[in-house]
């Protein structure tokens, strides 16, 4: 799913003051890097699931009924027919709606509505799939900005690849994977809140 997040790019001068705010765009090279990253993350998660070892997975569950009701109401108000009040849509169906409103006056409001409809992705020690990416296995094995979950699963995979058997891996990392997942999910929320506050301060300065 390709939902426009409305992310902005802040332009700062030499003294760190905000002198411009622009809509963030990504080029072809960045899209290629993202594809490589997604493939690496998917392969790492699949490897861990097949080996049945403790791991830190990135989990994104499907939208809940209450959020789908709100999205349904929004789409109806925009004259778009859907069945989302009765059953969970597939990411392909949501993507088709996004494509249908692209370039229309409804594009921004529909994008925002879909973003709010989505469940919050979290870290968990058990694989539950990634709804938005339509993947059975996913983890944050690599990323442009290094995350603790990346380092946690590097540690686990290094141990396994060095020959540690499955039973020892389970004893050594079951508790670790659970705690790392919980703490990483909690700290991610705090980091996002701080990031948004900082961004708001720069926007206000501009």
Annotate the PLM regions.
Residues 1-206:
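Electropositive polyanion-binding surfaces
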């Amino acid at each position: 799913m390709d939902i426009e997040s409305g992310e902005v790019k802040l332009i700062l001068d030499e003294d760190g003051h905000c002198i411009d705010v622009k809509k963030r765009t990504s080029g072809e090279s960045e899209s290629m890097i993202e594809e490589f990253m997604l493939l690496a993350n998917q392969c790492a998660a699949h490897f861990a699931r097949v080996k049945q070892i403790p791991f830190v997975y990135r989990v994104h569950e499907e939208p809940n009924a209450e959020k789908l009701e709100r999205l349904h109401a929004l789409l109806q108000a925009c004259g778009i027919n859907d069945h989302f009040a009765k059953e969970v849509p597939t990411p392909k169906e949501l993507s088709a709606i996004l494509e249908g409103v692209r370039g229309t006056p409804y594009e921004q409001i529909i994008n925002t509505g879909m973003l709010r409809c989505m469940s919050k992705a979290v870290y968990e020690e058990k694989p539950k799939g990634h709804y938005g990416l339509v993947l059975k296995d996913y983890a944050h094995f690599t990323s442009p900005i290094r995350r603790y979950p990346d380092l946690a699963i590097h540690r686990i995979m290094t141990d396994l690849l060095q020959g540690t058997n499955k039973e020892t891996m389970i004893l050594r990392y079951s508790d670790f994977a659970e705690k790392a997942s919980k703490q990483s999910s909690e700290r991610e929320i705090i980091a996002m809140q701080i990031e948004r506050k900082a961004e708001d301060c720069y926007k206000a300065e501009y």
